[in-house]
């Protein structure tokens, strides 16, 4: 949560003069020359959520034509992948600045693509630093419904306005037609705006969802350093040292891409640490995890563990100033208690992490408490209606445009 999201400033096409400058690269046209929905997800978790949503959409509307700026999961689900945006995901203010030119070019190419090909809707999936600015640019370009055009702008998975930059809700109401949230408490965060907001349930609790992790007291320790290159490079070495200080025989690590696999190998893990690609079901007796999406998966599975966070010092200092929440892990935030103790920056020492693993594996009361907390999480996030997010999207696409600012 203290991650400084991709903050791209002043990314606007020069429209006052009407001049269209040549772009460093262009996105390919949609498959078959036509498109109904453009999905945009810039992180691995968003790619997974988008893929699940796309499969549900295909079950309800098999003729729907979907293009995507996303990743391999959305491509495998049937999306026409224009660019693998997940391979370009960065974290932290310093890292964003280093990649500014690339993101500016991508931003402008995306605006141009939407102007030319006019999908019925653009579905933004999380990734607010890029996506919210794109929604604003589409309004200013008079492409979106909010700007007087004909492209609906929809957002799936709310930005964490309850953690920082709460005033974004007003610009979201101005630029978006509707928002679907995956956490029930988020609906109230927009109660003072005109933005239509609906809780559609968390995708991890969908009826067809197969959890990627499960608890097994005889299984190895699970180490989850995350899905972003810079974050993994900072977190994985300390996870390794904590595991080695604990003295367990084996550990497993799940990686989402070949890029992250290379980062893991660069840390020279011992032979007792097995690197596994995503896709299967991994058993674990305890987990040391980053604060990302997989931490919630582990919590829902009832695996005892802890959250570990290390960032660029400048990024962390800025995050402490901006973020106004008591916890980093989403499970802790939802429960309003530390289901997963958090070890942040200098507190994430090998000795502290080894002690945490001993507690997770050796204390039966810890496991029992984790099970109770996991059930509370499931009750909090469950949505009784099947395929709610897909139904929401199709309903929004069928509604008559309302060209009014929020």
Language-model-detected regions and their locations in the chain:
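Nucleotide-activated sugar donor-binding and catalytic core shared by glycosyltransferases
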Residues: 1-406
């Amino acid at each position: 949560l203290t991650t400084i999201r991709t903050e791209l400033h002043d990314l606007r096409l020069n429209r006052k003069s009407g001049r269209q400058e040549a772009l460093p690269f262009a996105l390919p046209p949609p498959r078959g020359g036509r498109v109904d929905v453009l999905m945009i997800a810039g992180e691995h978790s968003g790619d997974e959520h988008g893929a699940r949503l796309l499969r549900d959409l295909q079950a309800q509307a098999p003729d729907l034509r979907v293009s995507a700026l996303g990743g391999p999961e959305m491509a495998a689900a049937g999306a026409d992948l224009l660019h693998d945006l997940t391979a370009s995901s960065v974290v932290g203010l310093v890292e964003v600045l280093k990649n500014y030119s690339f993101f500016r070019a991508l931003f402008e190419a995306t605006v141009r693509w939407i102007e030319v090909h006019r999908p019925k809707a653009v579905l933004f999936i999380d990734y607010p630093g890029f996506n919210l600015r794109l929604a604003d640019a589409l309004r200013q370009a008079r492409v979106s419904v909010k700007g007087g055009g004909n492209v609906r702008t929809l957002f799936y998975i709310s930005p964490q306005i309850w953690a920082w930059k709460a005033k974004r809700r007003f610009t979201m109401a101005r630029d978006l037609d509707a928002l679907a949230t995956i956490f029930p408490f988020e609906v109230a965060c927009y109660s003072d705006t005109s933005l239509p907001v609906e809780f559609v349930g968390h995708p991890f609790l969908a009826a067809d969802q197969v959890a990627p992790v499960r608890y097994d007291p005889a299984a190895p320790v699970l180490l989850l350093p995350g899905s972003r290159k810079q974050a993994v490079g900072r977190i994985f070495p300390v996870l390794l040292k904590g595991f080695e200080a604990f003295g367990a025989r084996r550990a497993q690590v799940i990686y989402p891409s070949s890029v992250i696999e290379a980062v893991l190998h660069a840390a020279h893990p011992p032979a007792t640490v097995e690197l596994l690609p995503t896709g299967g079901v991994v058993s674990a007796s305890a987990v040391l995890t980053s604060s990302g999406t997989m931490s919630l998966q582990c919590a829902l599975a009832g695996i005892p563990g802890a959250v570990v966070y290390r960032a660029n010092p400048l990024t962390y200092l800025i995050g402490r100033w901006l973020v106004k929440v008591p916890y980093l892990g989403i499970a802790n935030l939802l429960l309003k208690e530390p289901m997963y103790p958090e070890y942040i920056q200098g507190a994430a020492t090998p000795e502290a992490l080894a002690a945490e693993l001993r507690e997770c594996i050796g204390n039966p009361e810890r496991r029992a408490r984790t099970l109770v907390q996991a059930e509370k999480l499931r009750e909090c996030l469950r949505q009784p209606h099947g395929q709610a997010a897909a139904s929401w999207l199709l309903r929004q696409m069928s509604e008559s445009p309302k060209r009014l600012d929020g």
